């Protein structure tokens, strides 16, 4: 399902623990790390897609998490042409995403990277909220920064990462 501008609707998930560290999944057989994300199926709401992707990629159910916030609007990124399947070239530009900020209220042991028959990740870790983006594929970095910045306002005040100084460091 691609919109008329060439963007595939998608959800992104920033999963935090009680210390506001974020979940990073390592892509299978790759050296890149990313947040869970996935396409929105026809007839599915962004929230329904988020819960489905969370289960498929991380093995967490709705009772394991609490929604803290979501982006106000779609965040978009373009995929470089050499990454686009030949049959999609000309009609596909990239992804538009609604991002969710979740708090893990379950245990770390509830995470299962093998909940799906087609796992996305082969390792995971908790990292600082404003982790450096050098392990994220380059064309997704700006969207990650925008999502982290917008959603940081939903974290508890005494644990909220300092946005301005960290974003400045990440942009360098």
Curated annotation (Swiss-Prot):
Belongs to the Nudix hydrolase family. RppH subfamily. Accelerates the degradation of transcripts by removing pyrophosphate from the 5'-end of triphosphorylated RNA, leading to a more labile monophosphorylated state that can stimulate subsequent ribonuclease cleavage. Its cofactor is a divalent metal cation. A motif (Nudix box) lies at residues 38-59. Keywords: Hydrolase. The keyword Hydrolase applies. This is RNA pyrophosphohydrolase. The keyword Hydrolase applies. It comes from Methylobacillus flagellatus (strain ATCC 51484 / DSM 6875 / VKM B-1610 / KT). It comes from the Bacteria. Its EC number is 3.6.1.-. InterPro entries: Nudix_hydrolase (IPR020476), NUDIX_hydrolase-like_dom_sf (IPR015797), NUDIX_hydrolase_CS (IPR020084), NUDIX_hydrolase_dom (IPR000086), RppH (IPR022927). GO terms for molecular function: pyrophosphatase activity.
């Amino acid at each position: 399902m691609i919109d008329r501008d060439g963007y595939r609707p998608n959800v992104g998930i920033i999963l935090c623990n009680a210390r506001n560290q974020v979940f990073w999944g390592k892509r299978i057989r790759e050296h890149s790390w990313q947040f869970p994300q996935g396409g929105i199926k026809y007839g599915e709401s962004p929230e329904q897609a988020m819960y489905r992707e969370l289960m498929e990629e991380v093995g967490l159910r709705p009772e394991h998490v609490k929604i803290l916030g979501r982006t106000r609007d779609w965040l978009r990124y373009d995929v470089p042409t050499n990454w686009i399947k030949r049959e999609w070239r000309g009609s596909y530009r990239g992804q538009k995403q609604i991002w969710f900020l979740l708090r893990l209220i379950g245990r770390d042991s509830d995470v299962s990277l093998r909940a799906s028959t087609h796992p996305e990740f082969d390792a995971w870790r908790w990292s600082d909220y404003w982790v450096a983006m050098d392990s994220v594929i380059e064309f997704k970095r700006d969207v990650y920064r925008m999502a982290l910045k917008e959603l940081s306002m939903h974290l508890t005040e005494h644990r909220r990462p300092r946005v301005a100084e960290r974003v400045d460091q990440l942009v360098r």
